[in-house]
Amino acid sequence: MKLLFSKPVTKFFLFCCIGMIVHSCMPAFLKPAKQFVLNSDSIAVMVIPADNILYTNIKTDLIEGYDSLSAEQKLVAMKEQSLLLSQLTDSIIYVSFVNKYIYYLTQTSLKVYTPEYDYLFESNKKKSVVKLAQIECEEYFDKVRDEDVINDAYLVYNDAYVNAFAFNLWVECTSPYNDTATVLFANNRITDKHYGWFEQDWNGNVLYYENNVELDLQRVENFLNKLAERYANYTFDYLLNNYINSTMATPEIPDSSSLHFDIQSGKFYYVDDNYKFIKL
């Protein structure tokens, strides 16, 4: 699930929204959830950007003489002989993702700091450190199967291969309610825009056609912008659930689920592993 922020959220707005949905018949864990959201503007979050970014090209079979290259030569070749990684730079990643992640985090009620403001961060009583420990950009081929039933009689299919780009993020996070750093992980991917279909000619032969729009740098940058917003929301939700777990012996949240707070509507939702950080 995704949150959209147009401006920093005020405590008055949160109070009005949550007050309309939290009542006595609600599950017990909504009480601490409400408390966390209403008091989240007292939590200071230090965001530490990643020191370096990994670029991994899994299309090694396209690199001539790959197996005979040294480890250093392989790293150079994997980036240079790629569709997207050859165009990506650390600066693009920082502008499209890291800086945007920090921005979207400031649009919540959390107080967000970066290392140059460490002296201000330390003056807060409730502190959380979010270290973007590792960022990895992967490029590879993904298999897509197109299927159809011809004349309502038999199944035909074709396996096509499309370019794929994956963004992997490892986060080390402490919270005001747990001093031990927890390693969190999230990843998402995009591929070429692919459309494949089957047609039958006059002779009864089944023909396969496909139309692909290849991934480009602009789509990757837009993708990273969206992930920055999504992962900022994951961070808020992680701190929310951490607080609930620290205040209740049995939070009673369904297995494999976490609580998500939608700031626009002021409502809480259950989310599965596809919409949150995964603990490692």
Language-model features and meaning:
Residues S123-A186, V271-L280:
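Surface-exposed short loop/turn segments
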Residues N52-L54, E136-E139, I190-T191:
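Solvent-exposed loop/turn segments at secondary-structure junctions
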Residues I58-D90, D142-A164, D192-N211:
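Mixed-charge, low-complexity intrinsically disordered segments
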Residues D90, Y94-I150:
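Short, solvent-exposed, polar/charged sequence segments at loop or secondary-structure edges
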Residues K2-F13:
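Bacterial N-terminal signal peptides that target proteins for export
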Residues F12-S24:
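Bacterial N-terminal signal peptides
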